[in-house]
Amino acid sequence: METRKGNRLSKIVTRTGDGGTTGLGDGTRVGKDSLRIDAIGETDELNSTLGVLLAEPLPENVRQVLLGIQHDLFDLGGELCMPGMTFITNEQVERLEVWVEDFNADLPRLKEFILPGGSRPAALAHLARTVCRRTERAVIHLHHSQPLSDALRRYLNRLSDLLFVLGRALNRCAGQEDILWVRGFNTQAPDNTQPEGSQA
């Protein structure tokens, strides 16, 4: 593939990773199954999941928040890719906290756990929340052997909180109430709920 000088990422096929290793930002090569690459990959998946959510019709304030988070996640991925460098700041974490408070302020208080779902944008926000939690687990796993910044770890924890609140807020925008978890739901269902054509 021909490349032009000045185009940072114009060369896509490099073949350097065919042996199962990949390069970090500092030039070192590590296995593609390493803890650091796993954390980077989870961060990439989280960002892509937010991209799917952004493809939905959304309130403009939510859209701008999510777009900002996508940029933050590139900072976070860059920090993971450059051991010893710090890109995620306390200010970015605090901004998430402000957004959580702002979006949560107009929501009714929860008296029970809620099920992920409702409108499609809300369901995608909940999906992004679970991917964020998985990303956080991968980061913590890496942190045990290769310490990471406090701000980076806190960012992912706050982001999952924000995505939970956004899921509720997006349902409210769609006129959809929270779907509350009902303890023992299936044991309370009447006998006539047996699927048609099934046999006891």
Predicted regions: what they are:
Residues 1-200:
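Phosphate/pyrophosphate-binding loop motifs in nucleotide- or prenyl diphosphate-using proteins
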